[in-house]
């Protein structure tokens, strides 16, 4: 449940004419209720965190870690949700966690995009869902199969992410 920086030190990347040092932060996110593993036969699974000296419920640790990543460590958010085609959990089970993280990113003013993970990202119904989410959240939503992702897809995700930063200054040098 403790967020991890990937890689531990920033990697230099180039997207078109823009060069940046980036690190991604991998965190659990908000728990999807139909998921397994956050409870055991005794009730909520307890985990140790860097924030408390005693174990706390996994769901609470996941929420605290995600909030800290959003508020204290991130510059931009990449929200990953799904159409439900990637496993045994239907789309409807993801919506509450999806809305929670998007509301939090919006409230703190962090730029973000949404990846719609799908085993069939090019199908019309997947594209229609992406359009619906784009309309609802007012941010770019990219249908993608994360399992089949290529280097070019990552480039496109980073490029789309950069467009979410507000322009604060334009400088023109004229001879």
List the predicted regions and their residue ranges.
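Switch- and interface-adjacent substructures of P-loop NTPase systems
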Residues: 1-110, 147
């Amino acid at each position: 449940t403790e967020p991890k920086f990937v890689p531990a030190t920033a990697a230099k990347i180039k997207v078109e004419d823009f060069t940046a040092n980036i690190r991604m932060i991998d965190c659990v996110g908000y728990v999807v209720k139909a998921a397994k593993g956050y409870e055991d036969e005794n009730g909520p699974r307890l985990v140790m965190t860097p924030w408390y000296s005693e174990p706390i419920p996994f769901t609470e640790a996941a929420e605290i870690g995600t909030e800290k990543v959003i508020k204290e460590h991130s510059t931009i958010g990449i929200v990953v949700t799904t159409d439900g085609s990637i496993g045994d959990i239907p789309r409807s089970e993801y919506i509450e966690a999806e809305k929670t993280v998007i509301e939090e990113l919006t409230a703190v003013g962090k730029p973000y995009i949404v990846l719609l993970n799908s085993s069939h990202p090019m199908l019309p119904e997947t594209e229609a869902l992406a359009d619906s989410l784009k309309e609802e959240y007012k941010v770019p939503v990219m249908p993608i199969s994360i399992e089949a992702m290529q280097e070019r897809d990552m480039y496109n995700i980073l490029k789309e992410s950069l467009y979410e930063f507000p322009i604060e200054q334009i400088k023109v040098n004229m001879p």
